[in-house]
Amino acid sequence: MPFDAMAEMSDETLLVLFANGDGAAARALNLRLTPRVMGHAYRLLGNHAEAEDVTQEAMLRLWKIAPEWRQDEAKVTTWLYRVVANLCIDLRRRARGVALESIPEPEDGRATAAEILQDAARAEALQEALDQLPDRQRQAVVLRHIEGLANPEIAEIMEITTEAVESLTARGKRALTAALSGRQEELGYGDER
Amino acid sequence: MAMSDRDDMSGLEVFFDAARAHAAEPSVALMARIEADAQAVAAQTSAPPRPRRASLSSQLYRLLGGWPAVTGLATAAMAGVWLGISLPEGMLDGANESAYLIDVAPELAFDLAGGNF
């Protein structure tokens, strides 16, 4: 099948095509899903190299599960978000058990904030604040407010109720607001309220 | 909830917008590794299964000539068993012993009876 014809196809259809031996479907899925998986893994981990490892592992699991995939079962992205979150949580638990002291302190952005774009500084500040949240709060906030998913889909990914999702995102946002409130002036946060 | 969603979002939305605009992107090397993984998994799952070595019984079955020959053999074997366990009454009933006894050396029998060695 021509590669261009795959642009309109759903992730689920492409996965079935891949399982049937279509190499172009794998390329299309790689281009479409890997950036999303990588972005999500980075937001949950705050570490580029670890996020790459998690992304490769999550995609490998997707290739392996392809022959057993049932189109009516779930969305590929829902499945991937769940796999990524589980891999990230496992990684963070292992890292916590190994050496807390070895984790570098977040860089003080005050000295460099004037030199870099304000928007990038905000993204970086948010990532630092996200890193301080408990795993489940971080996951819920990222899925809701950065990935832009609806609460029922987040509930499916996290295997909890929508009420629990709302509670996690509310607590997460309160913690983020508290963490970022001290950096309002530096990041131009007060100007846009 | 103490604060409404609107209140919560009043300041955070600019950070979320910034995070969306500055998403971490996969390197070219990572994309290549993932592509290679896909090809490796596809090659594994689409490889034809290795022919299994036939068992001894199936080799013997083929050696004998398949099902027609084995069916004939089984029938002959069962008939043999049946003949072996059933008494041959029909063959003996009312028959004269001399009809099926053949004396291959009558002179010898006479000599024995007469005691003339």
Language-model regions, residue ranges each:
Chain A
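Short helix-capping/turn signature of helix-turn-helix
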Residues: 32-35, 44, 142-149
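Helix-turn-helix DNA-binding module
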Residues: 128-139, 147-164
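Internal acidic/polar
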Residues: 7-11, 97-123, 150, 190
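Structural recognition of an alpha-helix C-terminal capping motif at a helix-to-coil junction
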Residues: 39, 53-60, 74-86
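C-terminal edge and immediately downstream basic/flexible tail or linker adjoining helix-turn-helix-like DNA-binding
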Residues: 1-5, 17, 156-162, 173-193
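Sigma70-family region 2
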Residues: 19-20, 46, 57-74, 94-96
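A short, charge-rich alpha-helical start-of-domain segment used by transcription regulators
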Residues: 16-39, 128
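Arg/Lys-rich amphipathic alpha helix in sigma70-family domain 2
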Residues: 64-71, 82-101, 119
